[in-house]
Amino acid sequence: MKSFTTIFKRNKISFKENLFLIILSIFLSSEILFAQQAEPTFAWPEGKQIAISLSFDDARASQVDAGTALLDQYGVKGTFYVVPNSVRQRLEGWKKAVASGHEIGNHSFNHPCTGNFPWSRQKAIENYTLKKMRNELILANKDIKELLGVESEVFAYPCGQTYIGRGENTKSYVPVVSKLFLSGRGWLDEGPNAPQFCDLAQLTGMEMDGKDFEQILPLIENAKKSGAWLVLAGHEMGVSGNQTTRLSMLKKLIEYAQNPANGIWIAPVGTVAKYIKGQKG
């Protein structure tokens, strides 16, 4: 027969374990409650659950040769971050895109990126100054205005790189972008934008090039968990190829987004950015 002392010790241990679990449960419940109180659900227009923006870089010919026609078919407005010299190569197509209501953003004058890319060696951001970058962004805006008659309010960082200079002299040009534009978008980021928290000058941009809708859907579902803003970014628009957003994927994505049951607001970057800015006061 077990001794009274042994039974007492075991009951004492059991009591301590139960007490620990009760305290842990109360702590976790209070943490969850605090998180819910600290970060209320963001109110998207018309009760939507999330926002999605479709954005495309570089003013590539395929965007106006094939891409905008698909967007127009569904009444969807995209955001096109352009480089002036590329616009000149398809000027009439870009004028038509503007007339259709697509947003034209600034993607710099020379598309400077790190000199680690051989093609960018002569315009490496390591050799830029903040003054040079600012002047070129203003020059690009001026050219876009002259070519297309619109003011670019949004910007996308070439190659997603937000710095200039080297080593101890490296500087962020995010403050420059913040002063000149409503928003600045990155590239190859890993998550959507939290509307209550995001820095409009450093919006995340998630790649949609080379992906089927089945690969994009998890990004949408993840954004729904927190009521986020998913900014998708691409380049060429076509059937297939390098750095190409597939038209077949876009068709499925748009049809999914336009189904009221899915609770998605699909709008240009500038439109969503202005809404968020207005909500923040």
Where are these regions (language model features)?
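Acidic (Asp/Glu)-rich catalytic clusters
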Residues: 68-75, 87-109, 177-178, 191-197, ...
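Solvent-exposed loop/turn segments at secondary-structure junctions
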Residues: 58-62, 85-88, 104, 109-114, ...
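C-terminal domain-boundary segment and adjacent tail
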Residues: 38-46, 86-89, 181-197, 217, ...
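Catalytic domains of cell-wall/extracellular-matrix polysaccharide-remodeling enzymes
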Residues: 66, 88-89, 115-216, 249
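Boundary/entry segment of secreted carbohydrate-active catalytic domains
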Residues: 36-64
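Structural recognition of the beta-strand scaffold that forms the well-ordered cores
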Residues: 51-55, 78-82, 103-106, 153-157, ...
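Bacterial N-terminal signal peptides
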Residues: 18-31
